[in-house]
Amino acid sequence: MDITDIRDQIDVIDDALVKLFLQRMQLSAQIATYKKQHNLPVHAPAREEEILKKVSEQAGADFEVYTRALYTTLFELSRSYQNTLY
């Protein structure tokens, strides 16, 4: 397999990631609506820590730090988007 083949596979994964990201952000908007209706804060650190723990375990030692960075960024983006809707 040459580099072009590998990049083609990454492109397919990137396409899927964008679709999943958009779905996640749409759900984040629904969460923002719920939080607003129930007077809940946008930031939910306990929930974020729960997710970080779970995904870190799923990723394993080799990728834990990268997985935590990815999800921390996702949380920041979700909070930012929720704040625009709140």
Residue ranges of predicted features:
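Domain-level signature for soluble enzymes in the chorismate/prephenate branch of the shikimate pathway
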Residues: 1-86
